[in-house]
A protein has these predicted regions:
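Mature catalytic core of soluble alpha/beta enzymes
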Residues: 1-215, 221
Length: 221
């Protein structure tokens, strides 16, 4: 949803991050509460307050800092530092910033799927940026076949190199990895866009694929 964009300087989330407003809409409230649940389940390894770290490492449109001061940044990263009170966001520290990029596509997929079901669709496949949700069967009358990309560095060819395919008739699927959005620092270390909020550093896992009943949750996991 547009209100959760960190790339649009006029979005509600961008204004919240700049401290210009503490008002929340239904989309941010829903996703913040869902994110908090997964933050607790993951013991903080998933956390939407990760934005200062994402910025410091040079993702989300920012230039990477030569040597990010992780100890300093981690002081205002943590899901326990934000609270919802009467429809407004309360931050324990004004420097806390939110980034819903890890959940926004999956959430949008779920919204589109819900709209299709309200319109009477029994068979559909919704896909946005690699996140998908399906129900029923394809036009061939068989379960949907969803390809899982081979995770080698620089694989930018959608569907050209696949590890395998999954047959699905219901549910959401999300794949995330470090083989597309990454760079190498001066020492040759690979820095991926997936940041562990507990350490402040990028993760080394190559690729994950998750299946859930709803795409928003698959995206989160």
């Amino acid at each position: 949803k547009a209100s959760m964009s960190i790339f649009d300087s006029t979005s509600l989330l961008s204004r919240i991050n700049r401290g210009e407003t503490d008002s929340l809409d239904e989309h941010i409230i829903y996703n913040l509460r869902l994110a908090e649940r997964f933050s607790r389940l993951s013991e903080g390894h998933y956390d939407v307050t990760v934005k200062p770290l994402v910025d410091a490492w040079g993702f989300a449109g920012h230039e990477a800092e030569r040597t990010p001061n992780l100890d300093s940044l981690l002081q205002f990263v943590g899901y326990r530092r934000v609270h919802i009170r009467d429809g407004r966001l309360v931050k324990d520290d004004p420097r806390v910033q939110l980034d819903f990029n890890s959940i926004a596509k999956g959430y949008t997929v779920d919204l589109v799927a819900a709209l299709m079901e309200r319109c009477g669709a029994k068979n559909y496949l919704v896909e946005i940026g690699g996140e998908c949700r399906c129900q029923g069967v394809s036009s061939k009358g068989i379960p949907w076949r969803i390809g899982i990309e081979t995770p080698f560095d620089g694989n930018m060819s959608d569907g050209a190199y696949l590890t395998g395919r999954i047959r699905m008739s219901e549910g959401g699927l999300a794949t995330s990895g470090n083989y597309r959005r990454f760079y190498r620092d001066a020492a040759g270390n690979k820095i991926s866009h997936t940041i562990d909020p507990t350490t402040g550093r990028s993760v080394t896992s190559v690729s994950y694929t998750h299946l859930r009943a709803h795409e928003t949750e698959a995206d989160l996991v």
